Amino acid sequence: MSIFDGKKVIIIGDRDGIPGPAMAECLKGTGAEVVYSATECFVUTAAGAMDLENQNRVKSFTEQYGAENMIVLVGAAEAESAGLAAETVTAGDPTFAGPLAGVQLGLRVFHAVEPEFKDSVDSAVYDEQIGMMEMVLDVDSIIAEMKSIREQFGKYND
């Protein structure tokens, strides 16, 4: 049984990292339902913060389906951007500018290069969709940053 079984997934891809459609393709056959997918330019947004519209989507889908049923997947090219996105969906918007300012959802959040995601999807599809980007990203830094955020702020660390 995958951590994605029966979960509602919000994908926040990165134009310079892992795009949304690549992660969505990997999720086929996992039992997860992608309820929203976007591909952003993290370096284009204010200091790498999560786009206000995406914050609104995360908030409304979490209200609709329940935080315990949600997983957020990010594809940011850099650990710092991935960490900001993860912090936003767990502890609230650190810039205090968006709908998640002061809202501690504590959601499950993973990066596409983390073993929790990679080991839950078809390896051939992963290699085809994400393998090339995995080679150029600083995977160890991304994993360390994501793990740190989950340990500090995650409510659903199963």
Swiss-Prot record:
Coiled coil: none annotated. GO terms for molecular function: betaine reductase activity; glycine reductase activity; sarcosine reductase activity. One of its GO terms (cellular component) is glycine reductase complex. The active site is at U44. It is an enzyme of class 1 (oxidoreductase). It catalyses: acetyl phosphate + [thioredoxin]-disulfide + NH4(+) + H2O = [thioredoxin]-dithiol + glycine + phosphate + H(+); acetyl phosphate + methylamine + [thioredoxin]-disulfide + H2O = sarcosine + [thioredoxin]-dithiol + phosphate + H(+); acetyl phosphate + trimethylamine + [thioredoxin]-disulfide + H2O = glycine betaine + [thioredoxin]-dithiol + phosphate + H(+). Its EC number is 1.21.4.2, 1.21.4.3, 1.21.4.4. It comes from the Bacteria. In the first step of glycine, betaine and sarcosine reductases, the substrate is bound to component PB via a Schiff base intermediate. Then the PB-activated substrate is nucleophilically attacked by the selenol anion of component PA to transform it to a carboxymethylated selenoether and the respective amine. By action of component PC, acetyl phosphate is formed, leaving component PA in its oxidized state. Finally component PA becomes reduced by the thioredoxin system to start a new catalytic cycle of reductive deamination. Monomer. Component of the glycine, sarcosine and betaine reductase complexes, together with components B and C. Belongs to the GrdA family. This is Glycine/sarcosine/betaine reductase complex component A2. It comes from Peptoclostridium acidaminophilum.
